[in-house]
Swiss-Prot record:
It is a peripheral membrane protein. Belongs to the CHIC family. A motif (CHIC motif (Cys-rich)) lies at residues 88-106. It comes from Mus musculus. Residues 1-26 form a coiled coil. It is found in: Membrane; Golgi apparatus. This is Cysteine-rich hydrophobic domain-containing protein 2. The gene is Chic2. InterPro entries: CHIC1/2, Golgin_A_7/ERF4. Pfam families: Erf4. Palmitoylation in the CHIC motif is required for membrane association. It comes from the Eukaryota.
Amino acid sequence: MADFDEIYEEEEDEERALEEQLLKYSPDPVVVRGSGHVTVFGLSNKFESEFPSSLTGKVAPEEFKASINRVNSCLRKNLPVNVRWLLCGCLCCCCTLGCSMWPVICLSKRTRRSIEKLLEWENNRLYHKLCLHWRLSKRKCETNNMMEYVILIEFLPKTPIFRPD
């Protein structure tokens, strides 16, 4: 029985090495940055809907634009409420010793989760079939030292056909 476990571990190591080798050859992810004029806790009020040239041949520009529009509509729905609570929280911050900022933090977290769920739905619906994976990621801004949320479009390695499931 111990020999069986050792063989299993060797096969597992081979699979892990093969996956790492496939990840080495995948191209750099595409970054879709926020292009809005309002940013609350690093989350912009809209993302760029311009089709990146590196996705040519992978996904249709119409599908890309539809996905970005879904994310932007989610932001359009949630962000005005967050801004109102942020202004209210800033006005009352001194009186409440900072506790008035908690609703803004919770609403911001809820907005991020709803976008992550939307991106996961998009991945399951379309993009995983095209060997792409969309996710919300925190990155450093190009212009200053602050952090911002961006959409990363990663290229998934194709699984070899000759390997059984």
